Amino acid sequence: FYLCCLFAVSCTCGNESVYQQHLIRIDEALEHADEYVNMKQQKISTIENMLNSRGVTPLQQYHIYRQLFIEYQPFQFDKAKETLERQLVIAKQIASDSLQHCTMLDMAMLHTTAGFYLEADEIFAQIDTASLTLDQKVYWYDARQKFLHDYQEYVTTSSIEVPDASQITRYQDRILEITSDDMPLN
């Protein structure tokens, strides 16, 4: 709701008819909000039912929880965090460092996006960047620069030592250094 209001206020600087069109679209979206929530909950229920299927391996469970995380992430922080915690337990059970790293990166990004910067910083500190795959390094640099940007942007009191803005640029440059134009990233 707050974002809608902010958007509406920012639109007042431009054309009045464009502003009215945006307000109409926002009103229409709000009218259908319950439908959107119901559709999201149905999709989540379908994915959750896959967890109860016979013969689901731990690796399959990990990937099902990944699907749940993707659905919950923009929808419910607590549920998204819970699915990541379950993924991490499974990744540890099957002794997959790679899956553990992926999950930890998702946790750091989730906490950053939600504004839990202290928690995100602690999670980043737990990740052994030397053992990340190339795709994971790209994700780490991207997540870390987003963390630094958001932290500098939204936090007025500094309880985390944040490097200057040039560190964000260094992370972006590092992504360009370790990737090539013809290399697909997952």
Predicted regions, residues:
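A "functional boundary" signal
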Residues: 11-186
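Bacterial N-terminal signal peptides
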Residues: 1-10
